[in-house]
Swiss-Prot record:
Gene3D superfamilies, per database record: 2.40.40.20, 3.40.630.30
Pfam families: AstA (PF04958)
This enzyme's EC code(s): 2.3.1.109
Active site as annotated: H229
UniProt GO BP: arginine catabolic process to glutamate; arginine catabolic process to succinate
Organism: Escherichia coli (strain 55989 / EAEC)
Annotated metabolic or biological route of this protein: Amino-acid degradation; L-arginine degradation via AST pathway; L-glutamate and succinate from L-arginine: step 1/5
Catalytic activity: succinyl-CoA + L-arginine = N(2)-succinyl-L-arginine + CoA + H(+)
GO molecular function terms attached to this record: arginine N-succinyltransferase activity
Gene: astA
Name of the molecule in the record: Arginine N-succinyltransferase
Length: 344
């Protein structure tokens, strides 16, 4: 059975394996053992209440409970930009006009922005390609909403998610090649690695501070502004069905879109509810797949189960209860996947 759980120190080798499969561009999952170990340690200290809000971040893994195989990772940053500035570009417009010459030009322009400072961030979502089946992607991505719903007071009112932009299999980014490389004088992969390993001072030192007309970029770079990597398109669709929207903010490195939503308007958070759980044989029928999560902060678990999402008493098997670290009579959080999201 596939189950979401908090990351543990022993997961570092599994995370290294996942990082080696990303193909680049996933800044927060670098193939660097020291960085990943530090990330795990920070997550553990977050759960233990040892860090200020500006440093808090939760990391979860998707595990096969039968074999112990770690198949994916996802994370939440509690409040971005409170220690190091959190940059993106806002895609706006500057108008140049002359009545005398009868000229009017509205020019798309990139403005350096820290507008999302303090927002909670969904990040580090990666599912091993071999496990992209049977609803695992939905479980991995949406499990974070179950955690946020259960422990709402630990998160801020706005949630953002940076989507990976267009990068080819060789690490070539049209947006970086046309813009970032001119200021940073390094390849995309190098900048991505430095950022992912916490060496972010160079961003503030070398970033262009003035607005940039997108018409000055190559056509190839203009075409990928706000577009996602093909492998990231499903993740974007999942978030958009939950209420996230692109509001004209993009990543400073690859031009990928930043999606955002008010936390209390996220579908899975808004519609999830607590029900009592009992042990038994679930009723047969064509029921939809639902997320089921316990309410245990330190031993949080989420699984997928087919059940009636309107039930007041959820029947689960002994195996499902064990995976959730629950007992009969406990209360669990329940919400169905979106109607069009299939798990088979």
């Amino acid at each position: 059975m596939m189950v979401i759980r908090p990351v543990e120190r022993s997961d570092v080798s599994a995370l290294m394996q996942l990082a080696s499969k990303t193909g680049g561009g996933l800044t927060s999952l670098p193939a660097n053992e020291a960085t990943l170990s530090a990330r795990i340690e920070r997550a553990i200290k977050t759960w233990q209440g040892e860090l200020p809000k500006s440093e808090q971040g939760y990391v979860f893994v998707l595990e096969d409970s039968e074999t112990g195989t770690v198949a994916g990772i996802c994370a939440i940053e509690v409040a971005v930009g409170l220690n190091d500035p959190w940059y993106n570009y806002r895609v706006g417009t500057l108008v140049h006009a002359s009545k005398e010459l009868n000229v009017y030009n509205a020019l798309p322009t990139l403005f350096l922005s820290n507008d999302h400072t303090g927002s909670s961030e969904l990040c580090t979502l990666f599912l091993d390609p071999d496990w992209r089946k049977e609803g695992n992607g939905y479980l991995l991505s949406k499990s974070r909403f179950m955690f946020m719903a259960a422990f709402r007071d630990k998160f801020n009112d706005k949630v953002v998610a940076e989507m990976r932009g267009v990068i080819d299999e060789h690490g070539y980014s049209p947006f970086w090649q046309s813009l970032g490389k001119r200021f940073f004088s390094m390849d995309f992969s190098r900048a991505d690695f430095l950022c992912g390993t916490g060496q972010k001072a160079f961003i503030a030192e070398l970033m262009p501070k003035h607005p940039i007309y997108t018409h000055f970029l190559s056509q190839e770079a203009q075409d990928v502004i706000g577009q996602v990597h093909p492998q990231t398109a499903p993740a974007r669709a999942v978030l958009e069905k939950e209420g996230f929207r692109y509001r004209n903010y993009i990543d400073i490195f690859d031009g990928g879109p930043t999606l955002e939503c008010d936390i209390d308007r996220v579908r899975a958070i808004r519609k999830s509810r607590l029900v009592e759980v009992a042990e038994g044989q679930p009723a047969q029928g064509d029921f939809p797949a639902c997320l089921v999560a316990n309410e245990n902060y330190h031993h949080f678990r989420v699984v997928l189960a087919r059940t009636d999402p309107a039930t007041e008493r959820l029947i689960l098997t002994a195996e499902q209860l064990d995976a959730l670290k629950c007992h009969a009579g406990d209360r669990v959080r329940l919400v169905r996947l979106c109607a069009e999201e299939k798990t088979a």
